[in-house]
Regions:
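PP2C/PPM-type serine/threonine phosphatase catalytic domain
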Residues: 1-182
Length: 182
């Protein structure tokens, strides 16, 4: 039996909470509006609503469906921004999962993360789409330097920013007792 819990808090740093999530059966999603831009809250709400509507209309949900749902939300947001100039620059991250038996399908864009907690170890599944992650991967900065780097909040991919969106996705085998964190 799977138990799902959702919680979103504003925290101590931000003045507004731009996080949104949904849980529907075996499907979960988290979006986080880009706080430095206009419309981050609108983008995250719109994206989570579009993703939910897309996925809950399907009979079964697999890895490609998760990618397609994010791409669908991206197109809807891009189209909305084209009609409402005041929303220019808005965007959001997205991480979406679906559990099918012992398989965890996932898709992500941005820096909202997916983790699997097993046997006392927390393992990050997704890779951030951020400038500091690219610098780390290139060996130009260390993990410690990521935390204070001036570009630590700069995303290299986000939902709703460009017409064409590359979505990362994968499949993880899960075991009884695993905890999935988005």
């Amino acid at each position: 039996m799977n138990n799902f819990v959702g919680l979103s808090k504003i925290g101590l740093v931000r003045q507004r909470n731009e996080d949104r999530f949904f849980i529907d059966g075996h499907i979960c999603a988290v979006t986080d509006g880009m706080g430095g831009y206009s419309g981050g809250e609108i983008a995250s709400t719109y994206a989570v609503d579009e993703i939910k509507e897309y996925l809950t209309s399907l009979e079964t949900v697999g890895q490609q469906d998760l990618c397609d749902a994010i791409i669908h939300a991206n197109q809807r947001i891009v189209n909305r921004v084209a009609c409402e100039e005041r929303l220019a620059g808005m965007g959001t991250t997205a991480v979406v999962t679906a559990i099918n038996g012992d398989q965890l399908y996932w898709a992500s864009v941005g820096d909202s993360r997916l983790y699997v907690y097993r046997d006392g170890l927390l393992r990050q599944i997704t890779t951030d789409h951020s400038m500091v992650q690219e610098l780390l991967t290139a060996g130009e900065i260390t993990k410690d330097e990521m935390l204070s780097h001036p570009q630590r909040n700069l995303l290299t991919r986000a939902v709703g920013v460009d017409q064409i969106l590359e979505v990362d996705s994968g499949v993880e085998s899960i075991l009884p007792g695993d905890r999935i964190l988005l």
